[in-house]
């Protein structure tokens, strides 16, 4: 297939302008659908903008493409593998991965994944409207779901190393320049950022080596839990977007889950922890906050301003993670 019209997306500025352009992408979306016998495929609309070009077809399928930018080849392999792993366990609701492949042609091959479309909203869209009791019920169900995800066996020939070392190296790289990254984000107050270097413990203190290396979703934000809210009751339909999945540790998983999805609320955190059944709670608040600081994304941005106006990182850790 002639993919030359997509060559402009090798440039970052052009990518930002074009990755949601339905007129540009519709012929390629329809070609993918035709290749896999998905018909009809006339109505194409853009999905919620993220990192990758993603389009909804006839409200039945989602076609997601992976470009050269943002390490697309690795993201494709990771999301395909993690999605198939999640589908193997009925305790983990997720979107059915219907097809995969690549457009081909000259230059970048544009690998893609095709998922069944889920008519839903994200829990992040309605979290402020959900009752306190319902939030606890959601969190309790998530505890079992995430425990199941973390228990999936890792294949020796898959993209997820069966070793703690790559994750330890990743955290070490995140530690370098951690304070400066938070200054650039501007979410945490300057007096807390000044404390980061002294607050961060040795990397080994953040990894539970008593557990085997395991898969983590690594970006469990409110955007990535889909469902329906009817008469004040939430029904979970799918956990989605495994593009950042990796071999990792519980504390890294907790960062986006608690600070983004739960908005730092401790009652859902307590329910989640009880359902997950974490064995070791030694120095829990510090290890949890330190891993949040090292996260590849700014997981603090949704927290209420009054919550992060703590005098010290130690007091912030207690406010967020003492349950």
Which functions belong to the PLM regions below?
Residues 1-29, 83:
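Phosphate/pyrophosphate-binding loops and the adjoining catalytic core of nucleotide-dependent enzymes
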Residues 13-18, 70-74, 309:
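Short, flexible/disordered intra-domain loops and linkers
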Residues 140, 177, 244-250, 255-323:
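Helix-rich C-terminal or lid/interface subdomains of diverse kinases
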Residues 26, 80, 266-270:
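Short, surface-exposed alpha-helical segments at coil->helix boundaries
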Residues 92-93, 132-134, 211, 264, ...:
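Membrane-helix interface segments
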Residues 50-58, 63, 201-252:
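Active-site acidic catalytic loop and adjacent metal/ATP-binding pocket
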Residues 41-165:
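ATP-binding pocket architecture of kinase catalytic cores
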Residues 20-40, 102-106, 113, 119, ...:
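An alpha-helical support segment within catalytic cores of ATP-dependent transferases
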